Amino acid sequence: MQRSNTSEFSKFRVAVLGYKGIGKHHIQVLKKLGVNICGILTSSETSGSFATNEIQKEFGIHTKAYTSLDNLIFNSKPQAIHICTPNEVHFSNILKAFDKNIPVFCEKPLLWNESITKKEIDKKLLAISNHPNRRIFLNTSNSSIISQIKNYLINIKNVKSFEFEFDTNGKYKFNNIAYDLFPHGLAMLQEIAGTSTRFNDFAEYVEEHKYVCTFKYKTIDVSFKFCQHKNLQKRMEFCINNNRYQRLQNIKNQDCLVSVKDFKAKKIFEIKNPLESFIIEFLRFC
């Protein structure tokens, strides 16, 4: 991917919906890229005041908080919107942005709540797909980990097995752990083997803080293992044809530095922050 500079996006106006959690990481990357963060959406005036004060203190950014997306769009006139809100309101925010012809960068899952049915999912996906102003990126940025290290991977064109392990200090339990973390492994798997709509021989094992599944993806034997608990340290490892790798992250001067450790070769490869790579691609798409 071609590298960017801060002047490339300096006149581009982006609004971020949701600040806590992943929203803060989006602001960190957008600030590094020189983007004009023209507004944020929060759930209340109190949380908005807290967010704008913290953003000013940590990133030196002066922005305005809104509690209404309509007001945010009308007043701040964003050229793109990053959706980092709770899953339950993704769909309504996406359509509202599309109605104003604003492209969307949406956090995963695209749409989800515990009571949603397959029929409702299909209906909402169809509404997104058929919208005349549909321009949307889903944050499956971990695919870029594979794309950036492909030249170092052994037998990448003849993958027989793929294992993915992800531990986080997230809040989800039981099957909801998979709804949160499954897209990370799937994005990497699709980067390796291309897309497929079928999983064969699917089996799963679920505990309160653990989710494990195995399945066949095309000709690849796949295993996913996820753990979530407030006391866990974040850890991501993956194994391709029994060769194990680990994603390493370090924050330095408000910049997320990412590398991949190859256990067999005893080497560490520096890569671009996957979220930054995906956001750059999205901004150029806009």
Residue ranges, per PLM feature:
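Beta-loop-alpha module in the N-terminal Rossmann-like domain of NAD(P)-dependent dehydrogenases
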Residues: 16, 61-105, 109-125
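A contiguous active-site-proximal alpha/beta segment in oxidoreductase catalytic domains
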Residues: 88, 111-170
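C-terminal helix-rich "cap/oligomerization" subdomain common to oxidoreductases
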Residues: 1-9, 16, 80-83, 135, ...
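Receiver (REC) domain switch-region micro-motif
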Residues: 40, 81, 162
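NAD(P)-dinucleotide binding in Rossmann-like oxidoreductases
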Residues: 204-208, 217-280
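N-terminal Rossmann-like dinucleotide-binding module
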Residues: 1-59, 283
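Rossmann-like dinucleotide-binding domain that binds NAD(P)(H)
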Residues: 167-233
